[in-house]
Amino acid sequence: MTAMDRLDHVSNQLAAKRQKKNPEGKPFRITVVGSGNWGSTIAKVVAENAKELPEEFHQIVKMWVFEEEVDGRKLTEIINTDHENVKYLPDVKLPDNIVAIPDIVDACADADIIIFNIPHQFLPKILAQLKGKVNPKARAISCLKGLEVTKDGCKLLSNYITEELGIYCGALSGANLAPEVARQKWSETTVAYRIPQDFRGEGKDVDQSVIRNLFHRPYFHVRVIDDVAGVSLSGALKNVIAMAAGFVEGLGWGDNAKSAVMRIGLVEMIKFAHMFFEDCQSTTFTHESAGVADIITTCAGGRNVRVGRYMAEHKVSGFEAEKVLLNGQSCQGLHTTREVYELLAAKNVIDEFPLFKATYQIIYEGLPMEKLPELLEASED
């Protein structure tokens, strides 16, 4: 028995001991909304747990897929027949209990737990289709990386989901590059989930132990905390920092420069969090995978740093780089940078966030990347 086999065996024994038995005899039904590389990866994780915990989770995990054709075949057909998302997560076998569904309402109608995992700019359209058509007792987890921003302030996407659908929503974020998680390379993540005010009782409703059982794997360790705002903001703002890290990497400035960007970015992230969400906990950013660990990982190899690097190396726009590099997927940092800048400018506090400001100016106003150190130094005078 290999070390990983032993780890699997011990993990399965522990999971069996803590498995919640629904007194109504109805395991929780799971739906994943989204089938990009991270959506497909999370579907793989929860489908594996559904198989191992049949008294707690329904054996079938539904995954909503935006239908498209790949080499003349529908993507849902490929996933359901070949058990592989050949476009967004190639060369990774998916569990056969994942069922790809092209209709969003059909995918979510009877779900007890809905996991949202789509580019955040598509969320309003998705929620409009689901409004009034989901189980009113369902719970949700947002894996989205972004904010709902207006000139008056910003809203967590988890709160936006709650307001639109009337169901409680937590958040998942961490140092999780999807290809590594999908290939079962060990990592950890943070799930923020508070017990809902209308909690119906242990075994009848989703509590923190159910959430941990749903996501925790021997290769994907889960810490469940209460700070939904902190986890959500970390997942969104780290992408802005990663864009800037990509700039300095593409310019060939080395690891010292990238570390400086990451340090300044972490400071601005915490300042932003406390400015708009007073109940955020600073330890979320410094102690959890969703905080500094996610910044490090995202700046080392995520799609946002790749886009920023390509912009610097090839002197192209962010959206050109996105098109070349991401195979139809979204670079969230491009959108979040604009949203954060517009909010801070409307509040007349943009100069308190020099890295966020400079990143916006580079992407959207053509500011030379080489001016980044000068702008950051001037802000400290």
Swiss-Prot record:
Substrate binds at residues 145, 303-304. Residues 1-27 are annotated as: Disordered. Its EC number is 1.1.1.8. It is an enzyme of class 1 (oxidoreductase). One of its GO terms (cellular component) is cytosol. Belongs to the NAD-dependent glycerol-3-phosphate dehydrogenase family. The lineage of its organism: Eukaryota, Fungi, Dikarya, Ascomycota, Saccharomycotina. Keywords: NAD, Oxidoreductase. GO terms for biological process: carbohydrate metabolic process; glycerol-3-phosphate catabolic process. NAD(+) binds at residues 34-39, 66, 122, 178, 303, 332. GO terms for molecular function: glycerol-3-phosphate dehydrogenase (NAD+) activity; NAD binding; protein homodimerization activity. The active site is at 238 (proton acceptor). PROSITE patterns: NAD_G3PDH. The keyword Transmembrane helix does not apply. It catalyses: sn-glycerol 3-phosphate + NAD(+) = dihydroxyacetone phosphate + NADH + H(+). InterPro entries: 6-PGluconate_DH-like_C_sf (IPR008927), 6PGD_dom2 (IPR013328), G3P_DH_NAD-dep (IPR006168), G3P_DH_NAD-dep_C (IPR006109), G3P_DH_NAD-dep_euk (IPR017751), G3P_DH_NAD-dep_N (IPR011128), NAD(P)-bd_dom_sf (IPR036291). Pfam families: NAD_Gly3P_dh_C, NAD_Gly3P_dh_N. This is Glycerol-3-phosphate dehydrogenase [NAD(+)].
